[in-house]
């Protein structure tokens, strides 16, 4: 299903939360423990730390997705293990625009992207670096 038919994306809030914020746990715990959400992430668990900032999309009582971004010692803002309800391309694009706006000035933005989302990342300015069976490493091109 497409979440656009259920909610207007412009009314949806994308909240930025510290990786160990109690509010983060309240918002994402019901999702990260759901089998269907883990399956969409190729059965890899989600994790967080003080080095992470999470972008969480919600409206009312419903959370529609999240993208954690980890800041590495090498000055990289790294996207890995994210979830977007229904693989909604419009919501994923909106997440990426928020992340790019927040990090592009000070960090190199890299993503371990699910192959099925590579085209959406490409349309937001990411270029492929290395491809595997289920993932492609991508980097945001500042020369856009």
Which residues does each PLM region occupy?
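Conserved beta-strand in the GNAT
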Residues: 56, 61-70, 78
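Conserved GNAT acetyl-CoA-binding A-motif
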Residues: 103-115
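Short amphipathic alpha-helix that is part of the acyltransferase structural core
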Residues: 2-41
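Conserved acetyl-CoA binding element of GNAT-fold acetyltransferases
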Residues: 75-87
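Short hydrophobic/aromatic beta-strand or adjacent loop that forms the aromatic wall/cage
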Residues: 52, 132-137
């Amino acid at each position: 299903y497409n979440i656009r038919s259920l909610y207007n994306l412009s009314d949806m809030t994308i909240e930025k939360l510290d990786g160990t914020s109690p509010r983060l746990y309240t918002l994402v715990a019901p999702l990260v423990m759901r089998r269907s959400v883990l399956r969409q992430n190729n059965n890899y668990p989600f994790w967080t730390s003080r080095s992470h900032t999470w972008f969480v999309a919600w409206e009312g009582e419903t959370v529609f997705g999240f993208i954690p971004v980890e800041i590495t010692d090498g000055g990289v803002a790294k996207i890995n293990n994210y979830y977007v309800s229904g693989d909604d391309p419009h919501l994923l694009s909106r997440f990426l625009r928020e992340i790019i706006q927040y990090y592009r000035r000070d960090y190199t933005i890299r993503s371990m992207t699910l192959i099925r989302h590579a085209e959406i990342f490409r349309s937001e300015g990411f270029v492929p670096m290395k491809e595997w069976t289920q993932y492609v490493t991508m980097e945001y091109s500042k020369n856009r």
